[in-house]
């Protein structure tokens, strides 16, 4: 499914929206679309175990547990304390909490989640996994986000990005659709690795959607 050049009308999807969404129990909008995708693509990137991996706007993503189990140092960034607590509770990990500059640091089981604003992050990482960050943002907010994410990668770093494509006339986000022209503009040099249809009923009921996997490497 490809539809280029779609602009998403302005909406307020700032921190207040996500705090409210998590409080209502609906934050994990990508839940259930995971499973084999990460296992099928991450090993091909040949990132050395022990490398620090950034997961922006992480929510309670089980991808963080998968990465930690495979020997990576995982750093998620998430605005909602509900999501941070839920991740560690669901994986039965006792987390330690401490202030860390502008963040509250949750840490345990090889996973660190920095509770706070992603734009306050100033560290760099060997790799990043974005499955729920870019697609959580409406069109007008994505350039700033992508620019900041690119700057968080070390020279020679790699980004694994997952976007979703669907007809925005059939449903509204989040997750928002991101089409190939925009993905390449936001992440220069990004290469499409795969696309596969999403088969859950909520997608088939609105005419279908594709999950698209991209890889970008920094110079």
Cite the ranges covered by each PLM segment.
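A short, conserved alpha-helix within the catalytic core of class I
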Residues: 136-148
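Hydrophobic beta-strand segment of the Class I
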Residues: 128-129
């Amino acid at each position: 499914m490809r539809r280029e050049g779609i602009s998403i009308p302005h909406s307020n999807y700032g921190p207040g929206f996500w705090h409210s969404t998590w409080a209502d129990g609906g934050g994990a909008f990508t839940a259930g679309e995971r499973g084999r995708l990460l296992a099928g693509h991450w090993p091909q990137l040949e990132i050395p175990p022990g490398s620090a991996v950034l997961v922006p706007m992480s929510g309670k993503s089980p991808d963080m547990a998968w990465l930690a189990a495979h020997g990576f140092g995982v750093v998620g960034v998430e605005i909602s304390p509900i999501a941070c607590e839920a991740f560690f509770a669901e994986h039965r990990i006792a987390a330690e909490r401490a202030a860390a500059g502008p963040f509250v640091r949750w840490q345990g089981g090889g996973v660190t989640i920095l509770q706070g604003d992603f734009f306050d992050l100033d560290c760099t990482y060997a790799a990043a996994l974005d499955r729920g960050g870019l697609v959580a943002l409406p069109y007008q907010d994505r350039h700033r986000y992508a620019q900041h994410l690119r700057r968080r990668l070390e020279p020679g770093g790699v980004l694994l990005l997952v976007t979703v494509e669907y007809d925005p006339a059939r449903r509204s986000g989040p997750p928002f659709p991101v089409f190939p022209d925009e993905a390449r503009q936001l992440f220069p040099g990004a290469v499409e690795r795969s696309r596969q249809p999403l088969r859950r009923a909520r997608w088939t009921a609105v005419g279908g959607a594709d999950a698209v996997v991209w890889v970008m490497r920094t110079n």
